[in-house]
């Protein structure tokens, strides 16, 4: 068996990635989320495939085809809710994974980090298009509002929006193409994940100390396969409790009303995992400015390696930056809350303050804190 594992051209690639992979001996449970994201992706592809067997991407039948899946297909309700809540679990793991990367300075592995940002954009695009497919009220109006943002692009904006819509409004052509893209993107994401892993295995994993761990490596299997399996159990438990007991808690009640272009819902808002970006978008009165801020709210992650001023890699021994980091986490939670609130006083000013704080913390406070810590520790 060992001979096959180490010599077979295909199996040896798997062996070097998941079995004999030299791994730092001290990585914590925060390093579990990579494998959990892989599991989430597999769950989403499988449940999505079974849903696609019964779904129809036509404005006249899309809503009723989802109802048919829940009522008439064997375990259709389970597949549908696993897919819907699987997206939420996916984003929880994604945010924790990115948060871990920021805390422990993993962004210094630039190729892996940039690949991760591309993956984040791809997953967000996939989730957005998936939300449109049930063709409920929030699906329709969410698609209308978000795609309409592209009209803010000077000169080509309006043409671009109509090109994406396939007409003069969100209609049958839009739904059909969104379904096509929603189906193909997860497979593209899978390919990008392999590239992400390829870059990661070029440098090896980071660890909580941020120090070079070449002198202290252990094989991934059995140590981290067992450790990851514990994470899988916790994820699966949370996922099943969510799916079986509270399947609609993260959804919007408006989406149980079929799409109606003549009736606007009182509060148009995306799924919870986009609310922080939506709050940043809404906090700027100018349309183009809002779109730029929305894109920058994610793209700012690409500046992380350039903004790293500290002589230490991680925040483990840096209490000042640690404090600022947790303020950033609180700020993101505030933005998420604001994104779900109506556009009125005091939510407008809170959203604007939180948006300014978000960019200020990342671009100004964290780099300054890094320099102060270098000074205190005489690392200059």
UniProtKB/Swiss-Prot annotation:
| UniProt-recorded Gene Ontology molecular function terms | metal ion binding; ubiquinol-cytochrome-c reductase activity
Q: Predominant location of this chain?
A: mitochondrion
Q: Which Gene3D superfamilies match?
A: Cytochrome Bc1 Complex, Chain C
Q: How is the cofactor bound?
A: Binds 2 heme b groups non-covalently.
The record's annotation in PROSITE patterns points to: CYTB_CTER, CYTB_NTER
Q: How does it assemble?
A: The cytochrome bc1 complex contains 11 subunits: 3 respiratory subunits (MT-CYB, CYC1 and UQCRFS1), 2 core proteins (UQCRC1 and UQCRC2) and 6 low-molecular weight proteins (UQCRH/QCR6, UQCRB/QCR7, UQCRQ/QCR8, UQCR10/QCR9, UQCR11/QCR10 and a cleavage product of UQCRFS1). This cytochrome bc1 complex then forms a dimer.
Q: Which InterPro entries match?
A: Cyt_b/b6_C, Cyt_b/b6_C_sf, Cyt_b/b6_N, Cytb/b6-like_sf, Cytochrome_b, Cytochrome_b_C_euk/bac, Cytochrome_b_N_euk/bac, Di-haem_cyt_TM
Q: What else is on record for this protein?
A: Heme 1 (or BL or b562) is low-potential and absorbs at about 562 nm, and heme 2 (or BH or b566) is high-potential and absorbs at about 566 nm.
Domain of life, per UniProt, equals Eukaryota
Q: Which residues bind heme b b562?
A: 83, 182
CDD domains linked to this entry: cytochrome_b_C (cd00290), Cytochrome_b_N (cd00284)
Q: Enumerate the subcellular locations listed in this protein's record, separating them with semicolons.
A: Mitochondrion inner membrane
Q: What is this protein called?
A: Cytochrome b
- Where is a ubiquinone annotated to bind? 201
User: For heme b b566, which residues are the binding ones?
Assistant: 97, 196
What does the protein in this record do?
Component of the ubiquinol-cytochrome c reductase complex (complex III or cytochrome b-c1 complex) that is part of the mitochondrial respiratory chain. The b-c1 complex mediates electron transfer from ubiquinol to cytochrome c. Contributes to the generation of a proton gradient across the mitochondrial membrane that is then used for ATP synthesis.
- Please tell me the species this chain comes from: Microtus umbrosus (Zempoaltepec vole)
- CC annotations in GO: mitochondrial inner membrane; respiratory chain complex III
């Amino acid at each position: 068996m060992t001979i096959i594992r180490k010599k077979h051209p295909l199996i040896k690639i798997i062996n070097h990635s998941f079995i004999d992979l030299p791994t730092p001996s001290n990585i914590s449970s925060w390093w579990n989320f990579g494998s959990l994201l892989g599991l989430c992706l597999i769950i989403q592809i499988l449940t999505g495939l079974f849903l696609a067997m019964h779904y129809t991407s036509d404005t006249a039948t899309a809503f009723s085809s989802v109802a048919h899946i829940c009522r008439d297909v064997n375990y259709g309700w389970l597949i549908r809710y696993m897919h819907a809540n699987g997206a939420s679990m996916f984003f929880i793991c994604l945010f924790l994974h990115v948060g871990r990367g920021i805390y422990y300075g993993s962004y210094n592995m630039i190729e892996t980090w940039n690949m991760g940002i591309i993956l984040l954009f791809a997953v967000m695009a996939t989730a957005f298009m998936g939300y449109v497919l049930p063709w409920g009220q929030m699906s329709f109006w969410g698609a209308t509002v978000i795609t309409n943002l592209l009209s803010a692009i000077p000169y080509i904006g309006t043409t671009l929006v109509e090109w994406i819509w396939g007409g003069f409004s969100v209609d049958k052509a839009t739904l059909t193409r969104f379904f096509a893209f929603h189906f193909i993107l997860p497979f593209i994401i899978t390919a990008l994940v392999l590239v992400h892993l390829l870059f990661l295995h070029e440098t090896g994993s980071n660890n909580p100390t941020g120090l070079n761990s070449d002198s202290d490596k252990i094989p991934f299997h059995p140590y981290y396969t067992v450790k990851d399996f514990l994470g899988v159990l916790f994820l699966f438990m949370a996922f099943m409790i969510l799916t079986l007991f509270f399947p609609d808690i993260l959804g919007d009640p408006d989406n149980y009303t079929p799409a109606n272009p003549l009736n606007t819902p009182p509060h148009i808002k995306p799924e919870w995992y986009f609310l922080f970006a939506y709050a940043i978008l809404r906090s700027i009165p100018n349309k183009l400015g809002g779109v730029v801020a929305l894109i920058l709210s994610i793209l700012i992650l690409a500046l992380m390696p350039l903004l790293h001023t500290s002589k230490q890699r991680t925040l483990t021994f840096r209490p000042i930056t640690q404090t600022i980091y947790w303020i950033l986490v609180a700020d993101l939670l505030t933005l998420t809350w604001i994104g779900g609130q109506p556009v009125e006083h005091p939510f407008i000013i809170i959203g604007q303050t939180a948006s300014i704080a978000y960019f200020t913390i990342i671009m100004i406070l964290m780099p300054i804190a890094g320099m102060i810590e270098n000074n205190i520790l005489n690392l200059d």
